[in-house]
Regions:
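Conserved beta-loop-beta/alpha segment of the NTase-like Rossmann-fold superfamily
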Residues: 62-154
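N-terminal glycine-rich phosphate-binding loop and ensuing alpha1 helix
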Residues: 1-62
Length: 154
């Protein structure tokens, strides 16, 4: 199962932070909100993520492009221009980053990532700026038992 995370809004209510970076990249305990959301889903066995990027999406792309390096112990040999990775602390995640536009609304963002979702497969869909204490397994079970098109938690 995949988790689609909306990470493209402007974050106007906390503009003192979001003029530099998108709201999902605001840090809590030294890690972006987005990372915390992904850790929660990962704890429930969901490790395949589609991130709907928009406003300053390049910052999210740069974060994941450099994630492995930042989470590992490395030695840089400046004389030989070599890098040696000693310890890898990366997550067991697959992250697809899609530019869904700066002004695209929620439905439009979901439509733009549809090609990255498997036909007929259930997926989780969440905002990238809020962390909650929801049992994802029970939520998915509830959804599957009731056979509806969508299940909303709030």
């Amino acid at each position: 199962m995949k988790a689609v995370i909306l990470a493209g809004g402007l974050g106007t209510r906390i503009s003192e932070e979001t003029h530099l970076k998108p709201k999902p990249m605001i840090e809590i305990g030294g890690k972006p909100i987005l990372w915390h959301i992904m850790k929660i889903y990962s704890a429930y066995g969901i490790n395949d993520f589609i991130i709907c990027c928009g406003y300053k999406g390049y910052i999210i792309k740069e974060y994941f492009a450099n994630y492995f390096l930042h989470m590992s112990d490395v030695t840089f040999d400046m004389t030989s221009n070599q890098m040696e990775v000693h310890q890898r602390n990366a997550e067991n995640w697959r992250v697809t980053l899609i530019d869904t536009g700066d002004d695209t609304l929620t439905g439009g963002r979901l439509k733009r990532v549809a090609t990255y979702l498997d036909d007929g497969e259930d997926f989780c869909f969440t905002y990238g700026d809020g962390v909650s204490d929801i049992n994802i397994t029970k939520l998915i079970e509830f959804h599957q038992q009731h056979g509806h098109l969508a299940t909303l938690s709030a």
